[in-house]
Amino acid sequence: MTIRIVALVGDCYGAPGGIARYNQDLFESLVTADLQGPNAHEQQAEIFVVPRLGDASGIALPAHIRQWPPVFSRLLYSLVAFWVAWHHRPIDVVFCGHVYMAPLAWGLARFFGARYWLQTHGVDIWTPQRRLKRAAVEKADLVTAVSRVTRRRLLGWANLDPHRVRVLPNTVRDVFAPGIASPAYRERLGLRGGPVLLTVGRLASTERSKGHEPIFTILPALRAQFPDLVYVIAGDGDDRERLEARARELGLGQETVRFLGYVPDEELPDLYRLADLFVMPSATEGFGIVYLEAAACGLRVLGGVGDGSNDAIQDDRVGAMVDPDDPNALLRAIETGLNNGRVDPAAIEAYRRPHFARVARLVLTELMEAPLQRRLP
């Protein structure tokens, strides 16, 4: 039996960022191995991806995954999603990768008699939604959340059976592993060998709570103890210019703060390996795949309190959590992190692809075996 899945996503193949990578990992896990259950040998997932961003042309996609060209217009996107579902009917599952598209996903699931799976990541789902989105969330047959915090925040306002809300965290790829950074790469970045603090993430004006500015304010005190320390920021976005201006206002030159811009995926392992501490004391991270990538490379990590990064940091097993609004605590945490050395990457083994794939396939099997939720408005 083929399980046909229409996936409505913001981005997937051909797009950067943690959510795009999550979608890729999830879909590949669902199509590359048998599902669980007594009839597993008879089942095969086939996924039709409809993205709003990200062009997969020229990318060799895994077998049983097809991705359509990106469509940003809301109306046109809805028409394309309906056409894809109609053309490939019967459809068994409508997967929704963002609450923004939940009403459309719910409508398609009702029309085609399919099960409806909603994936949630972070702040997009932490607060109550307006009437239509709320109804679409509450009608999901299955909701998966990347962290315990996201699950708890969602259940705090949505009328959902807790048994229908499962935690399915990010996974980390095998390319992220301990090693020695290429000397040529370090030379290319102009790093002379002093301690390196590293943050990796999109610099978006809608995501200003990743902790860059609190770190800026304590860099002079840190450099008093570690004179050659450099804070390296990898990532690009519409907030980069403001952050660069803020660093200049504080008198932090290139010798102290280095903005790298976008870093290709293939360079990330070397970037993590040359750093001494990964720092992203965020207040609104849904999970944070970058924490896992850093820890997988042996790098100790520093996250914020109260958000989903706690799951990645595993209650201090691979680092620590700190309040970014407390400069003294932040300073002490970074000092401790720099003095404590590297971590054992075995601590994040549960987040490797084999375990993630088993849980993902089990979740899909449970969804297919569970009765459909009532589709009444």
Residue ranges and their predicted role:
Residues 8, 191-210, 216-219:
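Conserved donor-binding/catalytic core segment of Leloir-type glycosyltransferases
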Residues 300-303:
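Short hydrophobic beta-strand element within catalytic cores of glycosyltransferases
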Residues 283:
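Aromatic "clamp/platform" in nucleotide-sugar-dependent glycosyltransferases that forms part
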Residues 241-263:
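Nucleotide-activated donor-binding/catalytic signature segment of Leloir-type glycosyltransferases, i.e.
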Residues 137, 262-263, 270-275:
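Short alpha-helical donor nucleotide-sugar binding micro-motif in glycosyltransferases
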Residues 96-102:
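Short His-centered aromatic/hydrophobic patch
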Residues 339-375:
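A charged, aromatic-enriched C-terminal amphipathic alpha-helix characteristic of glycosyltransferases
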Residues 315-316, 320-327, 335-341:
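Conserved acidic donor-binding segment of nucleotide-sugar-dependent glycosyltransferases
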